[in-house]
C-alpha cells in the first residue's frame, strides 16, 4: 500500500522522503565541500589548478557513470541497501580524501567519492515512487537536497578550512554523512529486490540505447544537456577559486557568493519550468543560456576591471539563472 492509505503509511512515507532528501544532501555536501578549499589543496600538493580540476572532473564523471548501474543494483539488492552504500561510501571517501598523502591519492579518492555518491539518486527516486502517488511533488522535495547542500556546505567548509586547514574542512562530508547513515539504517525498512536473480549483463542492452541516441532530436537534446552539465560541474568545482584568485575576495566571501549561486539556481528552477510551459522549452533554454553568456562574461570582465563586489554578485546571480536550464 502507498502513502495515502493509512496514517501509519503516510507517516512512514514522509519519513522516507525526509531521509532520502538528507541522504542526497549528504552526498552533495561531501562533493561541494571540496570547491572552496581548492587553493589550499593546490598549495599543499604543489600542483596547478588544472591538476586539481582534472581530479574533480574524474569525480563528476564517476558520479555520472554510476547513475546507470545504480538502478540495476537497486533491482538486485534492494533500494535501501544501495542508498546505505552510497551514504556510507561518501563518509569513508571523505576521510580518505582528507588524509591523502599525495595528489594521486587525492584524485583516486575523489573519484571514489563520485562513484559512491552517484549510486543514490536513481535508486532513491525508484524507492520514493513506491511510497507516493503524487511522485512529482516528492521528487521535487528530494531534489531540494542539492540546493540545501550548496547553500550550507561551501561557507562552512571554508570557515573550517581557514581555521583548521583544508583536510579538516573536507571532513564536513563525513560529519554529515555518518548521522544520516545511522538514521536511514534505523528508520527505513529493508526493501525486497525486484530482480534478485538477474545478472547485470542481462540487464545491460546497448542496442536500444544506440538506436535511441541515433534519433536527431534525442541526440541534439543529449548534446545540449551534456554541455550544460559540463558547465554546471565546472562552476561547482571552480567558482569559489575563481572568485578568490581572480577577484581577490576572501575564501569566506567567495564561499558565500557560491552559496548565493545555489540559492538562485534552486530558486529559479520553478520559474523557468513555468516559463517553459508558457513560451516553450527551446525559447526558455535560449533565455537561460543567454543569461549564462552574460554572467560568465561579466565575471571575467569584472575581475579584469577590478569593479568590486556588487558587479561580481550580479554576475553570480546571472550564472545561477543560467544553471536553471535543467528545469525546462
Question: In which residue ranges do the predicted regions lie?
Answer:
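Cytoplasmic helix-loop-helix junction between adjacent transmembrane helices
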Residues: 107-148
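Helix-loop-helix hairpin linking two adjacent transmembrane segments in secondary transporters
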Residues: 142-192
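Extracytoplasmic gate region of multi-pass secondary transporters
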Residues: 35, 215-267
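C-terminal transmembrane helical hairpin of 12-TM major facilitator-type secondary transporters
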Residues: 279-328
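Helix-breaking motifs and short loop linkers at transmembrane-helix boundaries and internal kinks
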Residues: 46, 78, 96-104, 133, ...
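Cytoplasmic membrane-interface "Motif A"-like loop-to-helix N-cap segments
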Residues: 76-87, 277-290
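Flexible cytoplasmic inter-helical loops of multi-pass small-molecule transporters
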Residues: 185-207
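Conserved MFS/SLC helix-loop-helix module at the cytosolic interface between two early adjacent transmembrane helices
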Residues: 65-104
Amino acid at each position: 500500500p502507498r502513502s495515502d492509505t493509512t496514517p501509519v503509511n503516510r507517516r512512514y512515507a514522509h519519513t522516507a522522503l525526509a531521509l532520502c532528501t538528507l541522504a542526497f544532501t549528504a552526498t552533495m555536501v561531501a562533493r561541494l565541500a571540496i570547491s572552496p578549499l581548492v587553493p589550499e589543496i593546490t598549495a599543499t600538493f604543489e600542483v596547478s589548478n588544472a591538476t586539481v580540476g582534472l581530479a574533480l572532473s574524474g569525480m563528476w564523471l564517476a558520479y555520472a557513470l554510476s547513475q546507470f548501474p545504480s538502478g540495476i543494483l537497486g533491482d538486485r539488492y534492494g533500494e535501501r541497501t544501495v542508498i546505505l552504500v552510497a551514504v556510507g561510501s561518501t563518509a569513508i571517501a571523505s576521510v580518505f580524501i582528507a588524509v591523502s598523502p599525495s595528489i594521486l591519492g587525492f584524485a583516486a579518492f575523489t573519484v571514489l567519492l563520485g562513484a559512491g555518491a552517484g549510486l543514490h539518486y536513481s535508486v532513491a527516486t525508484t524507492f520514493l515512487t513506491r511510497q507516493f502517488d503524487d511522485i512529482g511533488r516528492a521528487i521535487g522535495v528530494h531534489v531540494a537536497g542539492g540546493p540545501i547542500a550548496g547553500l550550507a556546505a561551501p561557507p562552512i567548509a571554508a570557515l573550517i578550512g581557514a581555521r583548521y586547514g583544508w583536510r579538516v574542512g573536507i571532513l564536513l562530508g563525513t560529519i554529515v554523512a555518518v548521522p544520516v547513515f545511522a538514521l536511514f539504517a534505523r528508520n527505513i525498512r529493508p526493501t525486497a529486490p525486484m530482480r534478485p536473480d538477474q545478472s547485470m549483463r542481462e540487464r545491460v542492452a546497448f542496442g536500444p540505447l544506440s538506436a535511441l541516441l541515433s534519433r536527431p532530436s534525442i541526440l541534439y537534446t543529449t548534446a545540449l544537456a551534456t554541455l550544460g552539465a559540463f558547465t554546471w560541474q565546472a562552476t561547482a568545482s571552480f567558482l569559489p577559486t575563481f572568485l578568490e584568485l581572480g577577484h581577490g575576495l576572501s575564501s569566506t566571501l567567495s564561499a558565500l557568493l557560491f552559496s548565493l549561486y545555489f540559492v538562485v539556481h534552486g530558486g529559479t528552477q520553478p520559474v523557468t519550468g513555468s516559463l517553459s510551459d508558457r513560451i516553450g522549452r527551446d525559447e526558455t533554454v535560449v533565455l537561460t543560456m543567454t543569461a549564462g553568456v552574460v554572467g560568465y562574461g561579466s565575471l571575467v570582465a569584472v575581475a579584469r576591471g577590478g569593479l568590486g563586489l556588487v558587479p561580481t554578485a550580479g554576475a553570480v546571480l546571472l550564472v545561477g539563472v543560467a544553471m536553471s536550464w535543467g528545469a525546462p
